[in-house]
Structure formats: structure tokens, C-alpha cells
């Protein structure tokens, strides 16, 4: 099985090394095409105003000076054009991609690009505790549980334009409770702040401070399940149509 690996933390990120070890438990045919630097929060953005640079770093290892979506496009249209991947894995992200995170996440967006191309695609992220913030995030749960959560998905039928979002809890492997399939949760991002600072030359600059809190019923979504210590699996699809609203919206124009 040909597997493409990508991410949004950059090709040199620790999570990429973890993902490669997970993937090699499934196949020896691995190709890595990922951004050359961190592109967290890039969503599904494309690079359209400057050329993309592709650099080969080793056998089947390529860095793209672009976004995660750029990297997947480059892999499918150039690097792996003659032998397309049969599976795309994106991650392992340093930090959760839960609830509304998926809308901003370059990790999930890279998997979504694969899904749009008709290729089974899975995003993987490692949640970390607040005290674990920084560069020393433990990927132990992802490494121990990665292949376990992937194998059943590979044997299952895939709906068109669908993908899976997997999050590993901030627990030691032996403390993980198991695997739960849960829907996407909801955070209250109305609490987001814009922090103002002033540089030495007197010019203002700003930081986005994400301060949202979970606001979904307990134990029913990816947010609560991951916090409780479960590996979460959430099926996603690329069709963003609100099908429940179609009839009511149609009636507005009669």
C-alpha cells in the first residue's frame, strides 16, 4: 500500500517522525511531502501569488515552501503522479484538532484535500496538557495507539469525499481508556481576544488569543471524550451543505 504522509507542523516536526513510524507498521511504501516550515492554522489555503518551491531532502522525502494543501496538491500532481497514494495520513499534529479546530487546521485540511481527490485520508493529532505546552510535547499515546486506530478504518468502506479526524488524549499510553467514535464538538470562540502590544519603535501589533471553552453536553463529543482519556475518531465529509435547511430555504423563494 502506497502511503503519503504530510502535516502542517513542517517536515522536520517531531510529529512527522512519529507518523512515519506509525505508517511503517502498515506499509514500507512511504512518501513524505510536507511544508518546509510550520503552517499551523493554515486551513485549506493555497499559495496563488508566488511560485511553489519543491526540495527533495532524501529518498521519497520532499519539502514544499507552501501550505499543507499545497503539499498534498504537489504530491498528487507531481511527486506521486505516476503512482498515486492509496492512503493519506496527515499529522501527527502537536496539539488537538477538536470541535471547531477542524475549520482552521492545516492538518485536517490536508486530509480533506486527499478526500476530495478520492483517496482515503486521515488526520491525526496529539492533545497535550497545558503544562505540556511547548516543544516537549509527548507523542507517546499517538505512537502506541496509532496503528491500532488506523487498521480498522482501512478495512472499512469509505463514503465519497469523506475523511476521519483522530485525536489522541494527553495521557500515557497505559492510561488511555480506549477508542470512541464521537461527533465534532462546539467551542465558544466568542471568548477569543485580540491582545495589543507595542514594539520598540512605537508601532502597535497584535496577537490572537484563543480562549474558547467547551460548551457541548458532557461526554457526547470529541471535546469531552478526549478530555476523559479516549482516543477519538470523528468521521467528517467535504460536503458543507446544510441539508436540513434546504427545504426551508427553498420555500423562501417560492
Swiss-Prot record:
It is found in: Cytoplasm. SUPFAM superfamilies: SurE-like. The keyword Cytoplasm applies. One of its GO terms (molecular function) is 5'-nucleotidase activity. Its EC number is 3.1.3.5. Binds 1 divalent metal cation per subunit. Its cofactor is a divalent metal cation. Keywords: Cytoplasm, Hydrolase, Metal-binding, Nucleotide-binding. The keyword Methyltransferase does not apply. This is 5'-nucleotidase SurE. It comes from Rhizorhabdus wittichii (strain DSM 6014 / CCUG 31198 / JCM 15750 / NBRC 105917 / EY 4224 / RW1).
Amino acid at each position: 500500500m502506497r502511503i503519503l504522509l504530510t502535516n502542517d507542523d513542517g517536515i522536520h516536526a517531531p510529529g512527522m517522525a512519529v507518523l512515519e513510524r506509525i505508517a511503517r507498521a502498515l506499509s514500507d511504501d512511504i512518501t513524505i511531502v510536507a511544508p518546509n516550515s510550520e503552517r499551523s492554522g493554515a486551513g485549506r489555503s493555497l499559495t496563488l501569488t508566488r511560485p511553489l518551491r519543491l526540495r527533495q531532502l532524501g529518498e521519497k522525502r520532499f519539502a514544499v515552501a507552501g501550505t499543507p494543501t499545497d503539499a498534498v496538491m504537489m504530491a498528487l500532481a507531481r511527486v506521486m503522479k505516476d503512482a498515486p497514494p492509496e492512503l493519506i495520513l496527515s499529522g501527527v499534529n502537536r496539539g488537538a484538532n477538536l470541535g471547531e479546530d477542524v475549520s482552521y487546521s492545516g492538518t485536517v485540511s490536508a486530509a480533506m484535500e486527499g478526500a476530495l481527490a478520492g483517496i482515503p485520508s486521515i488526520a491525526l493529532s496529539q492533545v497535550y496538557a497545558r503544562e505540556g505546552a511547548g516543544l516537549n510535547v509527548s507523542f507517546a499515546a499517538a505512537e502506541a495507539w496509532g496503528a491500532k486506530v488506523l487498521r480498522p478504518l482501512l478495512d472499512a468502506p469509505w463514503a465519497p469525499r469523506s475523511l476521519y479526524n483522530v485525536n489522541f488524549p494527553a495521557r500515557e499510553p497505559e492510561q488511555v481508556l480506549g477508542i470512541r467514535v464521537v461527533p465534532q464538538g462546539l467551542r465558544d470562540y466568542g471568548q477569543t481576544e485580540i491582545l495589543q502590544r507595542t514594539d520598540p519603535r512605537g508601532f502597535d501589533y497584535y496577537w490572537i488569543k484563543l480562549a474558547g471553552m467547551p460548551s457541548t453536553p458532557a461526554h457526547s463529543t470529541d471535546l469531552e471524550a478526549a478530555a476523559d482519556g479516549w482516543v477519538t475518531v470523528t468521521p467528517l465529509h467535504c460536503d458543507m451543505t446544510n441539508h436540513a435547511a434546504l427545504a426551508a430555504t427553498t420555500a423562501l423563494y417560492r
